[in-house]
Amino acid sequence: MNPSHDLQGLKKKAKETFLYVLSALLLGIAIGAIDAVFGRVLLFITDFRSAHVVVLLPFLPLAGLGIVWLYRHFNETASKGMTLVMEAGQGKRESIPLALIPLVMAGTWITHLFGGSAGREGVAVQIGATLSHAFARRFHFPDNGRIVLIAGMAAGFGGLFQTPFAAVFFAMEVVVSGSMAYSALLPAAIASFTASATSHALGLEKFSVLLSQTLSLTDTKTVTYLILFGILFGLTGRLFAVLLQKVKQFMGNVLENPYKRIGFVSIPLAVFLFLGLSLIHISEPTRHLRISY
């Protein structure tokens, strides 16, 4: 053994760890701030839509066409969304366009405003991944910045939902299915908790649900049910992912034009949703609600 060689190795490792920690802190603050803006605007839009749903819902098809136009006009590559993140994490892509951040935020805001359904977790992860990957490329981190990318994904998820523990493990396992990127644990944890604290400090509301019942993990029956439900939920998630991929491929083959594709789906959807609004008036839980026209 060479003591001087070992010492140099320790110094190199300490320097590397320090850089990852510092990067995680900076990214956590930046991504948490973006999450706060995105989340607060989304909450405002949701309240506004709820108060004017009858007026806004018929314009859902036009909103969809507008979103397609935005991507095609400004950066069509960004329309791949999470696929870009996965490819970057697996080393199959050199960069993620920064245009993805404003486009995915605007697309989600528009979708929610006109009554469409768009998840927030994907947006949060894409925001964090895009910013962190650009940061990693700018400062030439090793392994195509994979650790920094994972930290950014954790920051995006943790900043929007303020669930830092869940964000860390989600980011560590989502890039490569079936494996955990343990080397990214420390940077991901720091970035996630920093982003969560930042978005909270900037006034982003955290959703909380109080549970009146507790589960006993010493009860064999309860544990058996939990295992069965876990298997069922996993299979359901797998089925959904496969069907989603197949439907996208099918629609892409049948209707290659994205404008026709969005119209084919959104126009009937808007009609059915609009006609279904009358059910709100006769449903027991909401019969006293007033809908603004």
Label every PLM stretch briefly.
Residues S292-Y293:
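Hydrophobic alpha-helical segments, chiefly the membrane-spanning helices
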Residues M1-S283, R287-L289:
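Alpha-helical transmembrane segments and immediately membrane-proximal extracytoplasmic
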